[in-house]
Amino acid sequence: NESEEWNGSTWTEGNNLNTGRGSACGFGTQTAAVMAGGHDQQTTTEKYDGTDWTNSGALGTGRRYLAGAGTQTAGVAFGGYAPPSPPAGFGLTEEFDGSSWTESGDLSTVRFALGGTGTQTAALAFGGATPPAVNSTEEYNGSSWTAGGNMVAVNKSNQGAGTQTAGLTFGGASTGTQTLGYDGTSWSIRPSLATGRSYFAGFGTDTAAIAAGNNPAATTVEEYTGDVETITAQTLTTS
């Protein structure tokens, strides 16, 4: 249930989440963040104010491996799955107003372990598993999803950054180090991650993004500038 804050060069430990969990979605900023869902099909939602996490309104449907986008007062969560095996995926989309969730239009392709970025009225969903990995992209307008340009390769457990018309995806179980940029219509290849990873954290813009932690690069952090993918390599603290 630990949280850490990034200042552009180093990490410092923040106050803990009230409920520890993995495979949740997160969105917002360092001083106004949201974390929702996670393992054990949690509906739990917590908000961060830069110091403390507080519980907020529960997701309508508990799930893990979902994606999120937007701000603390105007967010959106989509996709995900819950057992049994094989996994039962969700196309569900829910919008967050800062205190409660309401259901919106479903994804066209049911998927989990997908990437997401953007805003509540202009979100982007890409990749994921159905359970086979897919390369499809969908664009959200605040009420419904429509097809966007396909990624150049199938991928799942990838992360995203940026906006619907200037997006980025990187890492993942299928492509490892690959980074792609999206212009609102199509994807193009960008400089690769130095270390391949999946099921990790990612955030930022299409010209200033962070990839942090998880499998197999547990404490490794990379910073993307749009020209050179890694300008610093930092280590997440474990204390």
Language-model regions, residue ranges each:
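Polar, enzyme-active/binding microenvironments
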Residues: N1-S239
